[in-house]
Structure formats: C-alpha cells, structure tokens
C-alpha cells in the first residue's frame, strides 16, 4: 500500500478591492475552520486609501 493522502487544510484565496481598481492580495485561510467569506480593511495603493477587500476564489486555468 502507498502512503496516506494528506488532506488540504489551507486554501489560497484572492482578496479583491471593493473600490474596483483591480488591485488584489493573495492570502491563505483555513479550509476547515472558516466557512464565511472574509472582509478585510486593507490599503489599496492605486487610490492610496484603506478600503474593504472581499474574498474571491482563485480561478485555475485548465490546459
């Protein structure tokens, strides 16, 4: 038998600026503990202000 497969406990997410500037952060979050989407107030360097960033899933391109 092979080695057991490890479960993924963290997920990479994309935090997109609510100011619609196109700026985003990539970060990780626990897949097991957090079920709600994140809302964080972070700095958007495009407009030089702190704005809300909303969580989105990262789309993966299939080859």
Swiss-Prot record:
GO terms for molecular function: structural constituent of ribosome. It is found in: Mitochondrion. The keyword Transport does not apply. Keywords: Mitochondrion, Ribonucleoprotein, Ribosomal protein. The keyword Cytoplasm does not apply. Its main location: mitochondrion. GO terms for biological process: translation. SUPFAM superfamilies: Zn-binding ribosomal proteins. GO terms for cellular component: large ribosomal subunit; mitochondrion. InterPro entries: Ribosomal_bL33, Ribosomal_bL33_sf, Ribosomal_zn-bd. Pfam families: Ribosomal_L33 (PF00471). NCBIfam families: PRK00595.1, rpmG_bact. Belongs to the bacterial ribosomal protein bL33 family. This is Large ribosomal subunit protein bL33m. The lineage of its organism: Eukaryota, Amoebozoa, Evosea, Eumycetozoa, Dictyostelia.
